[in-house]
Curated annotation (Swiss-Prot):
Interacts with PPP1CA. Residues 16-29, 514-531 have a biased composition (Acidic residues). It comes from Mus musculus (Mouse). This is Protein phosphatase 1 regulatory subunit 37. The modification Phosphoserine is found at residues 56, 62, 583. Keywords: Leucine-rich repeat, Phosphoprotein, Protein phosphatase inhibitor, Repeat. Residues 1-12, 605-626 have a biased composition (Pro residues). The keyword Lipid metabolism does not apply. PROSITE patterns: LRR (PS51450). Belongs to the PPP1R37 family. Residues 1-47, 492-680 are annotated as: Disordered. LRR repeats lie at residues 226-246, 254-275, 283-303, 312-332, 340-360. PANTHER family: LEUCINE-RICH REPEAT, ISOFORM F-RELATED, PROTEIN PHOSPHATASE 1 REGULATORY SUBUNIT 37.
Length: 712
């Protein structure tokens, strides 16, 4: 290492050694330098270049510390543990315990989910008391944390907001009526608003947000915030705080409700900021500006923003803002352009009759307003007539408030006539007591008109409820169901629709055109088709001979409808049995039974159709059951005996030596309720086949053994 000149030891040869060393270093520097730069002007040379080496990748990280889990204390916690931890914290911090909090903790039951409310309203919370609350917040979460009027100072508010942000303690937070949280309190609140993803509702009524605190809140609302509802009533927002807030909210897409009442907002700068906010923000749904000083000039700015609101704002409250008929002209021009505004409250403004006339045309052109507030707006009978014209023209108006106005007999008569035409208005608020009239009989007329108006609203309410019930029925009709369309007259006459046959050969299952919407039906259909193929392969050419020897199997053309003469595969056959299966999200399918066979005519009156019939044996009677019905319950293993089983008649032994008692082993007769399911033979086949397999096998075995003796 080079020794500085002031530290070099004195000696006669010191200067010579220093010069020699300097020349050596200069030569080495020039050799190593790729550019060959000249030495500095002062003659001093830099030291030799230093090299830096790094350890291997495995040795770079010597250790790691995981972040603390805020919920490590909240697993399987009990009420006693929470109370004990809170009391220990109070003793450690030497602060008083809150009896109201202890009572609420003892009432909590389900600690795994968010608890409905933690109510600390009216309790005085200093810094130490707030610090003790951390033992509760680290173990429990709440939906609502109510800190209204708790006398929070900057330190206590900062501590509480940090806890709520870290532990995500609340979705709804009320900090209203805390006038001393100061700048640090608002800074912590802004950090909480920005970082807490679960916080949706913040109530800061009567909590001043001054010039030096507003930038923090504005920054939190502009960057990202999960807040959907923000109450800032009486927060001293007029001026710069409102400008910062409105500018930030132009880019906020999450806030839905903004309440700015009682902030002394003026009709110039403040209203201009609100108008610009409405131009750029289309996600805000409720804007409450009651009890401010918007005036007609400010309403002009707001209406300019409303014209740009193709969608977004749903409720606008302008209650008590010194608006007159001049401002109603601006609003009347803006209303035809709004497509989302549903509630407009203009109460307690001296609008007068002229203002309502200026507003009427805009309201008629507007098709979105459902609720209109005109309470205490200096209206008389003349203004009520203009309102009645709007009622008669409106197909959507639900509620109208006309209280605290001098509406007498003439105005009530106009409103009553308008209600006879209107079928949407459900509530019309009027003063209960009739107004004084020079003619005493008019007072009774007013009472009668008031009753008639109320009856008209009740009538509309009944109509709306009927429409809702009809819509509910239509909705329920779209639920999963199986319905039979185009019922056949054959069912009414007692004839049984059987499965179709093709080319004169009976078929044991549904036709190939049939289909269903469920997987189980598809599996049953595949099984039945496999059985059919096995039957046809085993029978071979015996079908024609068996049919020729059994004329009873050939149905008479007189018993069939005219549509039965068409081929089974014809989709236009009028006797097709269509069964529709509908299910929301799974589509709509229709399967068709293309052939309908009926039993031979009987001398006795027709009986309800059954799949299996076993009457007492008598020689002259027709067959006991249609052959297709008997085959529906037959097992595939007995397909060899199938041609001989078909001509079974009462009073005669069955072919192949089967006894007449064979029919007794068939599945029991279905209940009468199954008559309506005439087209679902495949389902009946699947149900009965599994029940009668064992009995059929026993009878067939017995018949095969006794056949020689019976035929003799």
């Amino acid at each position: 290492m080079e020794i500085p000149p002031q530290e070099a030891p004195p000696g006669p040869g010191a200067d010579a050694d220093a010069d020699a060393e300097a020349e050596t270093e200069e030569a080495s520097a020039e050799a190593e330098s790729p550019t060959g730069t000249s030495p500095p002007a002062d003659g001093r040379l830099k030291a030799a270049a230093k090299r830096v080496t790094f350890p291997s990748d495995e040795d770079i990280v010597s250790g790691a510390v995981e972040p603390k889990d805020p919920w490590r204390h909240a697993q399987n916690v009990t009420v006693d543990e929470v109370i004990s931890a809170y009391r220990q914290a109070c003793q450690k911090l030497n602060c008083r315990q809150i009896p109201k909090l202890l009572r609420q903790l003892q009432e909590f039951t389900d600690l795994e989910q968010r608890i409905n409310c933690l109510d600390l309203k009216g309790e005085k919370l200093d810094y130490k008391t707030c610090e003790a609350l951390e033992e509760v917040f680290k173990r429990l979460q709440f939906k609502v944390v109510d800190l209204e009027q708790t006398n929070l100072d900057e330190d206590g508010a900062s501590a509480l907001f940090d806890m709520i942000e870290y532990y995500e303690s609340a979705t709804h937070l009320n900090i209203s009526f805390n006038k001393h949280i100061g700048t640090r309190g608002w800074q912590a609140a802004a950090h909480m608003m920005r970082k807490t993803s679960c916080l949706q509702y913040l109530d800061a009524r009567n909590t001043p947000l001054l010039d030096h605190s507003a930038p923090f809140v504005a920054r939190a609302l502009r960057i990202r915030s999960s807040l959907a509802v923000l109450h800032l009533e009486n927060a001293s927002l007029s001026g710069r705080p409102l400008m910062l807030l409105a500018t930030a909210l132009k880019m906020n897409m999450n806030l839905r409700e903004l309440y700015l009442a009682d902030n002394k907002l003026n009709g110039l700068q403040d209203s201009a900021q609100l108008g610009n906010l409405l131009k750029f923000n289309c996600s805000l749904q409720i804007l409450d500006l009651r009890n401010n000083h918007v005036l007609d000039s400010g309403l002009a700015y707001i209406c300019e923003g409303l014209k740009e609101q193709r969608k977004g704002l749903v409720t606008l409250v302008l209650w008590n803002n010194q608006l007159t008929h001049t401002g109603m002209a601006f609003l009347g021009m803006a209303l035809p352009h709004t497509q989302s505004l549903e509630t407009l409250n203009l109460g307690h403004n001296p609008i007068g009759n002229e203002g309502v006339r200026n507003l009427k045309n805009g309201l008629i052109s507007n098709r979105s307003v459902l609720r209109l507030g005109l309470a205490s707006t200096k209206l008389t009978c003349e203004g009520a007539v203009a309102v009645a014209e709007f009622i008669a023209e409106s197909p959507r108006l639900l509620r109208l408030d006309l209280r605290e106005n001098e509406i007498k007999t003439g105005g009530l008569m106009a409103l009553s006539l308008a209600l006879k035409v209107n079928h949407s208005l459900l509530r019309l608020d009027l003063d209960r007591e009739p107004k004084k009239e020079p003619v005493k009989s008019f007072i009774e007329t007013q009472k009668a008109l008031l009753a008639e108006i109320q009856n008209g609203c009740k009538r509309n309410f009944v109509l709306v409820r009927e429409r809702e019930e009809k819509q509910q029925l239509q909705l329920s009709a779209s639920m999963p169901e199986i319905t039979i369309t185009a019922p056949q007259p054959l069912e009414e006459s007692g004839e049984l629709p059987a499965v179709g046959s093709q080319n004169g050969a009976p078929r044991p299952g549904p036709g190939p055109d049939s289909d269903s919407d469920s997987d189980s039906d598809r599996e049953e259909q595949e099984e039945e088709e496999e059985d059919q193929r096995n039957q046809q392969r085993d029978e071979g050419g015996n079908d024609q001979s068996s049919l020729a020897s059994c004329p009873a199997l050939i149905p008479s053309t007189d018993s069939l409808g005219p549509g039965d003469k068409s081929p089974p595969s014809s989709p236009s056959s009028p006797t097709e049995q269509r069964i529709s299966v509908s299910s929301p999200g799974r589509g709509h399918k229709v399967f068709v039974v293309t052939r309908v066979e009926s039993p031979p005519e009987r001398p006795e009156p027709p009986v309800p159709p059954t799949f299996v019939s076993s009457p007492p044996p008598s020689p002259p009677s027709p067959p006991a059951s249609p052959p297709s019905q008997t085959m529906d319950t037959q097992d595939p293993e007995s397909s060899e005996a199938q041609p001989q089983l078909e001509p079974s008649q009462a009073g005669q032994p069955l072919p192949n030596g089967l006894k007449p008692e064979f029919a007794l082993a068939l599945p029991p007769e279905p209940p009468p309720g199954l008559e309506a399911k005439g087209g679902s033979c495949s389902l009946e086949h699947a149900l009965h086949r599994s029940q009668g397999v064992s009995k059929l096998e026993e009878l067939l075995l017995e018949a095969s053994q006794e056949a020689p003796r019976d035929t003799l």
